[in-house]
């Protein structure tokens, strides 16, 4: 196929045009007065969303070169979403602001490589500043504030997530389910998260989230290596097929031939199955399988117990209300029938802790107790329509991710205030530590990082530059509350952002922007 080649300024300007189209669509959602975006779906009703990364994934332009710009800036949003789970709109707005500022200087003759170096040094300085100013999250109120802001200023969601975290702990699992009514409610149930994911991506049922999710599955637990399906699994698979229920297989390993047969059965719709390697090693693996068996009411198929895979019945399998498996972990949500057995098992493990010889043994036993007794918080999302349900689930996901990020690295003043204040500090630092084109790179960052605050103000119908100037004249904690159109202490107002979200958004935006500024040529397919 013939190729189209663009050089220098033409290449960079074409990328910028694509970025601008995408940023305009995404940034309308920013801030408390941000609007929604309607996405047309090839099937089903249109989706109304307020989530940056979801909008970014939908944008595909006709012009190949502009579309390359969209793909690059989408990367900043996706990477931020992977690391922090929130802050995707901020990352997108930052990346575009950096490119826009940077292109002016590159066009005027500044050296792009020196600019890139200056931008990277400036970002490194800002990251250390963000970490310095971050305040640890210690009370439920702070968690509630972070969750509310991330969910689009929804205090009900904020209190639900704070409640969930207080019950299952900071490391606990929070699972989202579609509720039956219109009220969103919280339920704590037995459950466990294993640090092992699916063996093959062909088991995936939800390609958007890249995960496997099954309701009411059977769970087959064995410490054996599955080599041939015909020999090891065929009898039990035939029994499960009759029940039309899915199967989670947890084994020491599944060899290639057996794995291929399982995948084929899944793809043909004969039996919905997902295979996961058992967690742990050696003796610990057997004990962890026993823990899962207690949680699910099943039996571990092991040689020691005189059981073999060929002649097992369905009554030896465990059961769960729901399982969610991704590439790194498996979450089993219990069905609530094994409460007494779980209590007894935890008691037994606590006795073992008291007589354990080594620190390592004690640590592993305590880890197992935490996994068994911690439980899982299930938030049942209620809504009047399916469209509202999808929007609520996206908001809840953002809020849960933001809350975890806040617990990890602390919180900073929200609403774009942190970056607006740091822009002043950065200028002072850069003038002392950098020179020539590197200084220009730092100044690009300094001018670009006020963009989120500017956009939040503009979405509220207020003049952005005026707000930026007023915020920068105040103390670090003072920012602009767009919901009430007042200035105040962001911690007192409850407008806080997780430091991790601000940091990763800034780093990813700089990474993408500096790559675009150092682009000299684009090669794309020629369209007819």
UniProtKB/Swiss-Prot annotation:
Recorded hits in Gene3D superfamilies, A to Z, give: GroEL (3.50.7.10), GroEL-like equatorial domain (1.10.560.10), TCP-1-like chaperonin intermediate domain (3.30.260.10)
Q: EC annotation?
A: 5.6.1.7
Could you say which residues bind ATP here?
29-32, 86-90, 415, 481-483, 497
Principal cellular location given in the protein's record: plastid
Q: Tell me if Nucleotide-binding is a UniProt keyword of this record.
A: yes
Alphabetized NCBIfam families for the sequence: GroEL, PRK00013.1, PRK12849.1, PRK12850.1, PRK12851.1
Q: What is this protein called in UniProt?
A: Chaperonin GroEL, chloroplastic
Q: What is the lineage of its organism?
A: Eukaryota, Sar, Stramenopiles, Ochrophyta, Bacillariophyta
């Amino acid at each position: 196929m013939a190729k189209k080649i663009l050089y220098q300024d033409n290449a960079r300007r074409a990328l910028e045009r694509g970025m601008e189209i995408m940023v305009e669509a995404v940034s309308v959602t920013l801030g408390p007065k941000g609007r929604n975006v309607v996405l047309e779906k090839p099937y089903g009703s249109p989706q109304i969303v307020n989530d940056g990364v979801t909008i970014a994934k939908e944008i595909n332009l006709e012009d190949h070169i502009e579309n390359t710009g969209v793909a690059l800036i989408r990367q900043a949003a996706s990477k931020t979403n992977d690391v922090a789970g929130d802050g995707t709109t901020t990352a997108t707005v930052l990346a575009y602001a950096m490119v826009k500022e940077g292109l002016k200087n590159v066009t005027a003759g500044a050296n792009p490589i020196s600019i890139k170096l200056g931008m990277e040094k400036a970002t490194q300085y800002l990251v250390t500043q963000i970490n310095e100013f971050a305040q640890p999250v210690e009370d439920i109120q702070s968690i509630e504030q972070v969750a509310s802001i991330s969910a689009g200023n929804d205090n009900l969601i904020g209190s639900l997530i704070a409640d969930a975290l207080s019950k299952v702990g900071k490391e606990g699992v929070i699972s989202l389910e579609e509720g039956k009514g219109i009220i969103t409610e919280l339920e704590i149930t037995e459950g466990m998260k294993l640090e092992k994911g699916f063996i093959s991506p062909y088991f995936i049922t939800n390609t958007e989230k890249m995960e496997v999710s099954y309701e009411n599955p059977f769970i087959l637990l064995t410490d054996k290596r599955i080599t041939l399906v015909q020999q090891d699994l065929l009898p039990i698979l035939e029994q499960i097929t009759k029940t039309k229920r899915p199967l989670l297989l947890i084994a020491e390993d599944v060899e290639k031939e057996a794995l291929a047969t399982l995948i084929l059965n899944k793809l043909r719709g004969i039996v919905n199955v997902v295979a996961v390697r058992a967690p742990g090693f050696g003796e610990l693996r057997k004990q962890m399988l026993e823990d899962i068996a207690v949680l699910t009411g099943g039996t571990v198929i092991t040689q020691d117990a005189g059981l073999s895979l060929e002649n097992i019945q369905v009554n030896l399998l465990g059961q769960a209300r729901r399982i969610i498996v991704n590439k790194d972990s498996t979450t089993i949500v219990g069905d609530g029938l094994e409460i007494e057995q779980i209590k007894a098992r935890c008691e037994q493990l606590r006795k073992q802790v008291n007589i354990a010889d080594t620190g390592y043994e004690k640590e592993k036993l305590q880890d197992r107790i935490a996994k068994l007794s911690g439980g899982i918080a299930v938030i049942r999302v209620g809504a009047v329509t399916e469209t509202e349900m999808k929007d609520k689930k996206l908001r809840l996901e953002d809020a849960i991710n933001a809350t975890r990020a806040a617990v990890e690295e602390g919180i900073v003043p929200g609403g774009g205030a942190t970056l607006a204040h740091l822009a002043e500090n950065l200028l002072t630092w850069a003038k002392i530590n950098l020179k020539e084109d590197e200084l220009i790179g730092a100044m690009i960052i300094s001018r670009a990082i006020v963009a989120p605050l500017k956009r939040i103000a503009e979405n509220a119908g207020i003049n952005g530059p005026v707000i930026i100037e007023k915020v920068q004249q105040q103390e670090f904690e003072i920012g602009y509350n767009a919901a009430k159109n007042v200035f105040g202490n962001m911690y007192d107002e409850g407008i806080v952002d997780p430091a991790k979200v601000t940091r990763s958004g800034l780093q990813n935006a700089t990474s993408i922007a500096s790559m675009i500024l150092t682009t000299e040529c684009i090669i794309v397919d020629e369209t007819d």
